[in-house]
Structure formats: C-alpha cells, structure tokens
From Swiss-Prot:
Keywords, alphabetical: Ribonucleoprotein, Ribosomal protein
Pfam families, alphabetized: Ribosomal_L39
Organism from which the protein derives: Pyrobaculum neutrophilum (strain DSM 2338 / JCM 9278 / NBRC 100436 / V24Sta)
Name this protein carries in UniProt: Large ribosomal subunit protein eL39
GO biological process: translation
Length: 51
C-alpha cells in the first residue's frame, strides 16, 4: 500500500485498526466470561477491508 494515503482512507484504516481489538478485561470479568471474544475481530490476511 502506498505510503502517502488520502486522509479519508487513512481515517477508515485507523478506525478498522481500533475496532479490531479484544474486549477489555473488565468486560470479561463483569460478564463472568460470557463475553470473551469480539464478533467483529478480523484477521489481516483472511478477511480484507473494503476501505
């Protein structure tokens, strides 16, 4: 990918990077491990973004 990106694409990629995280530890503790993984997780090689 190009080093110089348009601002809109850069913001979309940054939002996708932020959303691609595990739920916080306090959420796992509060729900008694009912919530342990995020359904929105994405692997960089398997699922490509439409950004």
């Amino acid at each position: 990918m190009a080093r110089n990106k348009p601002l809109g694409k850069k913001l979309r990629l940054a939002a996708a990077l932020r959303s691609n995280r595990n739920p916080p530890v306090w959420v796992v503790a509060k729900t008694k491990r009912r919530v342990v993984r995020s359904p929105a997780r994405r692997h960089w090689r398997r699922v490509k973004l439409k950004a």
